[in-house]
């Protein structure tokens, strides 16, 4: 006689085993209609699963995050159902849930086109409109294997052979004549799966191994209702308009080419943004009392063997050789910083020692993963490492956190999600050391009034870490900042200092990144601002234009005055109509356009116009210079009179 306890504390008593759906129906027909699955004693189960003993139960609907994930997973099965009807010889591989949607990897003879996707989506809707029940069956491993072998599903057979124990009872989900395999849960009926959209295809190797066959990956998105789906599609449309690759080309910021995959060719305007960002970071480094250093971009393989990188990271490292020695091009800066720390005897009085570098790093990312500035092979890290005593960890972490928020606020990022990753099962260091380290990180976040979630077991083997994920104007998440404690690397590389008792001790090392990759952060900013960079970051801050040739000398005088004040100004003296010039520079997202006519020459003033089309009238040139300098120096996100 199971007693079912609901989230509100109420209880329901039954004299026989009941399904999740039975309990939902007992509560009310509305809840039963909305029931996708259940959470029984913390574990997600299908709506059809029986509860045979006392249990805590929560009914899962499409309004719950778990419900939406289940719905998306079932849409992947719906995709499988449709593709097998249209192209029966297709072999199905894997179809997991991803952020905002799902994908399915398929082995199909022809290359899928946009027309194929439209046809596939139409068939999916036709199937979903039948509102058929999804039937779950738990079977023996052998029965599951026989089922898929008989259907020619080689990839499902391989999953069973290589990933599933012979003692397991896999779950088979029946969508009419189509059968798929999954741990579940899944929706009980396809009426939940009406609001989806197939998006694109790409190539994907089976098992992610380039030695295996290339499959075709079909991506889709799915939501609980039409309103959510349309809102997401609108966000995607806006994201496409903001794509940094498109804007980068329009604004002539950078380019990339096949001869240097994943490497950035910065053009003048893009490099101007890079250097301005670098200047800002340098100012903050000085404010927070960091040294700036520069290490070599490649070092002997022997050093990387000592650090453990060669054993655990070799496939991502570029190598070269000279005079019978093998060198690794650095994928990160930390080993070099330890080498600098090791030069000369250090005392506890020298700590904390804060060391920063704009480090040029290279990582051998798979070519298929490269994506504009967001995923590159050559990048610059705004990397820093703090060497300190165990007693100093809390204060130093506190300082790092303040620096993160200080810098992010300058760019207008307000929503920052913070996670604290704690000790994994395999780790070095005593439990006492880990407890203290985790407590120090948590206390620093709490002292700064920062809410955070724990990620149990997600820390590195050498220490816990804090991750800062910023959300942009489209609510996309970008993990940029980290504060990572390291109990391992200093000892591996023989770093030490003389303690108060005149004994040698190993310092704690704090890895600290805020922007992460400079290239990636510029990509994020380009999309956040849609190319409308705040004036302090804009490559060209002001364009001064004449209406006729008679104002040319005055335009040059005004331009020089602006340039002498340190403002990035250009003169446009072309023999073009003023409306054409204004439109062109507006499209180039230049913050300010100054127009000189005869009236301005006579009065010694200048007509000021913003890129958003706001006419600020004719102003004294010195006033314009002062106001622009105030805006630039304050790194304001807003233009004059906004």
Swiss-Prot record:
Classification via InterPro entries: aa-tRNA-synt_IIb, aa-tRNA-synth_II, aa-tRNA-synth_II/BPL/LPL, Anticodon-bd, Anticodon-bd_dom_sf, Beta-grasp_dom_sf, TGS, TGS-like
One Pfam family from the record: tRNA-synt_2b
Region (Catalytic): 243-534
Compartment(s): Cytoplasm
EC number: 6.1.1.3
Positions with a binding annotation for Zn(2+): 334, 385, 511
Catalysed conversion reaction: tRNA(Thr) + L-threonine + ATP = L-threonyl-tRNA(Thr) + AMP + diphosphate + H(+)
Lineage top rank: taxon: Bacteria
UniProt cofactor(s): Zn(2+)
Cellular component GO terms, alphabetical: cytosol
A GO BP annotation: threonyl-tRNA aminoacylation
Chief location bin: cytoplasm
Cross-referenced SUPFAM superfamilies: Class II aaRS ABD-related (SSF52954), Class II aaRS and biotin synthetases (SSF55681), TGS-like (SSF81271), ThrRS/AlaRS common domain (SSF55186)
A GO term for molecular function: tRNA binding
Keyword Aminoacyl-tRNA synthetase: yes
Cofactor stoichiometry and binding remark: Binds 1 zinc ion per subunit.
Keywords: Aminoacyl-tRNA synthetase, ATP-binding, Cytoplasm, Ligase, Metal-binding, Nucleotide-binding, Protein biosynthesis, RNA-binding, tRNA-binding, Zinc
Function: Catalyzes the attachment of threonine to tRNA(Thr) in a two-step reaction: L-threonine is first activated by ATP to form Thr-AMP and then transferred to the acceptor end of tRNA(Thr). Also edits incorrectly charged L-seryl-tRNA(Thr).
Family: Belongs to the class-II aminoacyl-tRNA synthetase family.
Family matches, as PANTHER family: THREONINE--TRNA LIGASE, CHLOROPLASTIC_MITOCHONDRIAL 2, THREONINE-TRNA LIGASE
Protein name: Threonine--tRNA ligase
The organism of origin for this protein: Yersinia pestis
